[in-house]
């Protein structure tokens, strides 16, 4: 299994993501609101930077990419619903079904700062440039315990206590950071997936303690109900309650592959979606124990 140790950015840390690097020639994905593209073709043409189940239409999966936000159905067909821009740090509001948050880059270059959508991703506005911004949050999470609290990483770990209007630096952030997830129990508890393992902070990111050591962890996700998911390389997808006391392995057999992004249907937690380092989108109807390619019938 190959792990590329470069800058603390998900697409550069993970060898599988680097293998699907996007060229300038691939920039114009030929789709608009009236056209569709198969997700298997979409993942060959762009990076996936985040997933979320559409809370107002749970049959749809929102896919944040290097070239815009797409909405995909169970048939595996996707359509772009936003303008063309690079969405990073994509995360849904934990309780408001219309709100989404992100960062990244506009098509013409530069940084977007902290941006929000109140129409399920169709239009976006900048809420704040962030601290020392405009920021480009590659990792971002909204606290399920207090949605006014948002964490993002740009030249350190930043925190907002007013839904992204103002930001302060909480600390340098963990070494080799890949992903962040806020706790459902406390706004000051934060989980970090890193090259060295899974970490937890109970003081809003000022200090960290290990939960999993000795293997890279490529994602961490916490549901509003308090179920923690993580992907441990060499082990597989694991889950635990909060606070985590032992991690249950719920699926393995990924070989040299691993999961990069995870989305759980808040209305039906058995429905789970994932993006792999090999550029595949997967779906599960048994809480991640078995998987099929998005667009294919579940067993």
Where are these regions (language model features)?
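Extracellular glycan-interacting surfaces
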Residues: 2-299
């Amino acid at each position: 299994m190959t792990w590329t140790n470069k800058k603390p950015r998900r697409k550069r840390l993970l060898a599988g993501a680097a293998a699907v690097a996007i060229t300038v020639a691939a920039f114009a994905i030929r789709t608009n609101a009236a056209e569709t593209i198969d997700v298997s073709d979409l993942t060959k043409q762009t990076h996936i930077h985040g997933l979320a189940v559409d809370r107002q239409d749970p049959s749809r999966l929102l896919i944040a990419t290097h070239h815009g936000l797409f909405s995909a159905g169970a048939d595996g067909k996707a359509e772009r619903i936003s303008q063309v821009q690079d969405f990073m740090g994509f995360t849904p509001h934990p309780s408001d079904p219309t709100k989404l948050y992100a960062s990244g880059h506009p098509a013409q270059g530069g940084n977007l700062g902290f941006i929000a959508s109140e129409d399920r991703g169709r239009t976006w506005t900048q809420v704040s440039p962030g601290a020392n911004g405009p920021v480009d949050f590659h990792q971002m999470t909204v606290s399920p315990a207090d949605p006014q609290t948002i964490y993002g990483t740009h030249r350190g770990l930043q925190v907002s206590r007013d839904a992204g209007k103002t930001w302060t630096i909480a600390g340098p952030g963990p070494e080799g950071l890949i992903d962040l997830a806020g706790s459902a129990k406390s706004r000051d508890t934060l989980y970090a997936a890193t090259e060295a393992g899974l970490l937890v902070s109970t003081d809003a990111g000022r200090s960290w303690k290990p939960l999993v050591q000795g293997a890279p962890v490529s994602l961490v996700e916490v549901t509003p109900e308090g179920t923690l998911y993580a992907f441990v390389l060499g082990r597989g997808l694991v889950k635990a309650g909060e606070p985590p006391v032992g991690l249950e392995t719920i699926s393995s057999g990924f070989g040299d592959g691993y999961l990069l992004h995870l989305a759980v249907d808040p209305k039906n937690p058995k429905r789970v979606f994932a993006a792999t380092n090999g550029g595949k989108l997967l779906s599960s109807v048994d809480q991640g124990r078995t998987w099929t390619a998005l667009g294919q019938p579940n067993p």
